[in-house]
Design a protein with these regions (language model features):
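Active-site His/acidic residue clusters
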Residues: 9-22, 37-81, 85
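Binuclear metal-dependent hydrolase catalytic cores centered on His/Asp/Glu-rich metal-binding motifs
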Residues: 19-33
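Catalytic metal-binding/acid-base residues of hydrolase active sites
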Residues: 56-58, 89, 107-108, 132-133
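Substrate-binding rim/cap in mid-to-C-terminal beta-strand-loop elements of soluble/periplasmic
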Residues: 117-159, 170
């Protein structure tokens, strides 16, 4: 309904008609491959303005086998290959010069734990590359996970909702 769409826009800053959702595949082992294939196809066909691809497989391996283990790093290498395929799809779609890539995660880990209070558990990667982004820049400011959303909002020149506590990481921009 129109009212539901308006609520969604206020809550998420986008119209429900502009959102395509792909659910995880039934076969967990095939899921990252299926997700990559769907993302590549979608990017080539639709040339989207914004795409979020969430590969949570390294998280599952970290909790099952342990973080900082050969199995965990093997899964990261696998996901790296999928990221390469997505980047190639962006290039083939002719939108590479207009694209910004952000690669991050929601938490670090020790052993098989989930987050925590140590730096190894709280630190996450934040890799950003693309249009109007400084090349080879190392972020000097401290950064929290909620700063990612604020940075994405800044990329799209959106007014940040007053209740957000995140701040855009402006030093990454040219």
């Amino acid at each position: 309904s129109s009212a539901a769409s308006d609520v969604y826009k206020r809550q998420y800053l986008v119209d429900t008609l502009a959102v395509n959702k792909y659910n995880q595949g039934i076969n967990y082992e095939k899921y990252p491959t299926e997700l990559c294939e769907k993302a590549v196809k979608y990017i080539k066909e639709k040339k989207p303005t914004l795409t979020l691809i969430a590969w949570d497989n390294p998280d599952h391996v970290g909790h099952k086998e342990g973080h900082d283990t050969p199995a965990y790093y093997h899964k990261l290498e696998e996901i790296d290959g999928y990221i390469g395929k997505v980047m190639n799809a962006v290039k083939e779609a002719g939108i590479l010069d207009e694209t910004i890539f952000i690669i991050t995660s929601d938490h670090g880990g020790i052993n098989k734990g989930h987050g925590g209070k140590t730096m190894q558990e709280m630190e996450t990667p934040f890799i950003i590359s693309g249009k109007n982004i400084k090349k080879g820049h190392e972020i000097q400011a401290s950064m929290m996970q909620f700063d990612v959303a604020a940075t994405v909002a800044a990329i799209f020149k959106l007014k940040q909702p007053q209740v957000w506590i995140g701040r855009p990481i402006m030093e990454v921009f040219k």
